[in-house]
Amino acid sequence: MATSRQLREQIAAGRWDAALAALYGGSEEVLSRQRSRYGAALEQFELYYGPGRQVQVYSAPGRTELGGNHTDHQHGYGLAGAVTLDLVAVASRNEDGFIRVKSRGFNKLDVIDLTEAEPQQGESTHSASLIRGIAEGFRAKGCDVGGFDAYTASDVLRGSGLSSSAAFEMGVAMILNTEYGCGLDAPALARICQFAENTYFGKPSGLLDQLTSAVGGVLFADFADPAAPKIEKIHADGVLPDGMTLCVTDTRASHSELTGEFAAIRNEMEAVAACLGGKVLGEVDEKRFWQELPRLREQCGDRAVLRAIHYFEENARTLAQRDALAAGDFAAFARLVEKSGHSSFECCQNVYCASSPKHQGLSAALAISQSILAGTGGAWRMQGGGFAGTIQAFVPDALVKRYCAAMEALFGPGCCYLLSLREQGAVRVM
């Protein structure tokens, strides 16, 4: 194991270029940026924790949701891809029983006393709660984990729908798993992270975000048994055909304060399920749902029923998307992407907040996307939890410049990201 200074010198000399190229691509422009980024993270670690420490460096990717919008928490199907935007963490084990994490862009140093295992008052919805919950998740699996000091630098947009929280969680989980020799596999780490987010952070999320960050590539998951989801990895290479670019636009309205809106989707879907004798919609007979619509409208309300309709139709669509990708039929996949986007808007109703109709950044971005991409073979949809954050578009290369210019005219310079899918999940890089 090398010290932070030794790693900085090795990175500058190009000794880690192969490892960086495997994650981000091998162009000199990309490598130069990542050398600088990793070097800066190591330097910041030294600033906060002192020089001479032996360290390891980890990477955990963000993800773009390709299908299955709000289906995973109902024990349905999910489809997502890891992206090249990631969180980098520099970490060193300590023996004092504390976890300390300083994250770029945040003033506070998170300090977690591991003798305090229970959720702490006032800590929910803060990163400290995730760290504490992840450590306790390891202990619940019989892992004897302890303290570490870490600095993180994330390029995953916070509150954007690219799952910055899952990248952060997986970074912390990778540190504990590696530094303390736990040997847990990627799905087990993902479940620990979901436990922390649900129980300690207080967000009722599904598992797809964490699984995609953990496993990498394009991931199809069947959550019929959420404790042991069936996972099928589709290799990232070849998913996008030549001449097609994945663009993600940040509408620059964070959804980080929208936990209540997200919870309402899950609660309303589960209210419909309860009326049909299930806990979640994945346990409900779809034919019976359609037969009992009048009663369900009266008992649960129209929005809950529409959200249940979205679940059933989106679930079938996600399965068809997987099959299209496996067959190399991007045209069929793109048509399904469009239908998914329309269902999120019309049925799931998570494109804007009904309580704030003046603010509809996602709606505007989708409307402009449709005006540019309709009939071109491209596709567009909102992604992630919704209400704010990002939209996703598959843009023919000939239209990328025009498309990005249109998005930047609405949301400002640098809002439109040209992304690549990433084969690797969360890893120790060096």
List the predicted regions and their residue ranges.
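Fold-level recognition of mixed alpha/beta catalytic cores in primary-metabolism enzymes, strongest
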Residues: 160-248, 430
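C-terminal nucleotide
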Residues: 1-63, 88, 92-124, 220-381, ...
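Beta-strand segments within the central parallel beta-sheet cores of soluble alpha/beta enzyme folds
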Residues: 100-102, 147-154, 184-195, 334-339, ...
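Phosphate-handling active-site elements
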Residues: 140-148, 176-192, 397-410
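Structural signature of FAD isoalloxazine-binding scaffolds in flavoprotein oxidoreductases
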Residues: 76-96, 215
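Glycine/serine-rich anion-binding loops at beta->alpha junctions
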Residues: 59-75, 155-172, 376-394
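Glycine- and acidic-rich phosphate- and metal-coordinating loops
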Residues: 135-157
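A short glycine/serine-rich beta->alpha loop
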Residues: 53-54, 70-77, 116-124, 154-162, ...
